[in-house]
A protein has these predicted regions:
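Short intrinsically disordered, low-complexity coil segments enriched in acidic
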Residues: 1-7
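N-terminal hydrophobic/helix-forming segments and targeting peptides
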Residues: 3, 17-274
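Basic polycationic patches enriched in arginine
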Residues: 8-9, 32
Length: 274
């Protein structure tokens, strides 16, 4: 998981004003008056949510936990649903998608006494639980130059390829683990960066500043070892994360993650970068 965002996130109290030699809050600084304390609080809440959700599986788990806390009732998709007026419910699919809904209080007025739809309406809001990234393939390793080892990945979603270069990257997603006669779906988010997609030195790619169209199958496969790891070691490393044997790992959906701390920035703290 990502670490706590830097102190700048909460830069409300004690803002220095060199011109007046005094300390102010955002509300008292004229050039920053449009960014309020409520704005900063909402931005920090958003940052906390994003950092808790490095994969679609973490996003679904986070949302379901918040729905439970808010009093929503979970409805298994494969069971009969008993819906009551005024009820609040949610269901999930594949542990990566969540659907939550509220039911009106007066259903008789909505449908009418004769069961014919009357003033029936609903409001719908939808959002992605995932984001563009690189997914680790079923065969996870590729031999690189010399003794190096690369991660065998495929593009997931529409992304701007060049933004992935030269960033230390972690792994996040879900892993299916056999425990006795059960199969458990477990979340994984490495606490450290384990891969990087390196740029070539400019003397090896003189035209890089004139237009570079990287080959995803060649240029965008991350480096994961300078010689310590060999073919077949990746699944053993994942097993170590759960303190299980490699043969207990039955499947995985793992993605590259940028663990750089999210932050609020700008002269008026009006931007968020994640």
């Amino acid at each position: 998981m990502k670490g706590t965002a830097p102190a700048r996130r909460g830069m409300l109290e004690g803002t220095s004003n060199p011109a007046k030699g005094e300390s102010m809050t955002d509300q008292e600084t004229p050039e920053r008056a449009h960014v309020t304390a409520d704005d900063i609080e909402a931005a920090n809440d958003l940052i906390d949510f994003i950092e808790a959700c490095p994969s679609m599986f973490h996003t679904a788990a986070t949302i379901m936990a918040e729905l439970d806390e808010a009093g929503f009732t979970y409805l298994p998709e494969n069971a009969a649903w008993d819906i009551e007026p005024g009820g609040r419910y949610y269901t999930q699919r594949n542990t990566s998608s969540v659907i939550a809904f509220k039911v009106g209080e007066d259903l008789a007025a909505t449908w009418g006494e004769d069961g014919v739809a009357g003033d029936y309406h609903f409001q719908l809001t939808a959002s992605h639980s995932d984001s563009p990234t690189f997914k680790v393939k079923a065969v996870p390793e590729l031999d690189g130059a010399g003794e190096t080892l690369r991660l065998n990945t495929e593009a997931y979603g529409g992304m701007i390829d060049y933004t992935w270069f030269d960033r230390p990257l972690a792994l996040a997603g879900r892993v299916l683990v056999r425990e006795g006669d059960r199969i458990e779906s477990r979340l994984l988010a490495t606490e450290r960066e384990v891969a990087i997609i390196p740029s070539l030195a400019i003397h090896m790619n003189r035209g890089v500043n004139e237009g570079f169209a990287p080959n995803r199958a060649v240029d965008l496969c991350p480096l994961i070892s300078a010689g310590e790891l060999k073919q077949g070691d990746f699944d053993a490393l994942i097993a170590d994360e759960f303190d299980v044997e490699p043969e207990q790992i039955l499947g995985r959906d793992l993605f590259l993650v940028n663990r750089q701390d999210a932050r609020i920035w700008g002269w008026a703290d009006e931007f968020i970068s994640t």
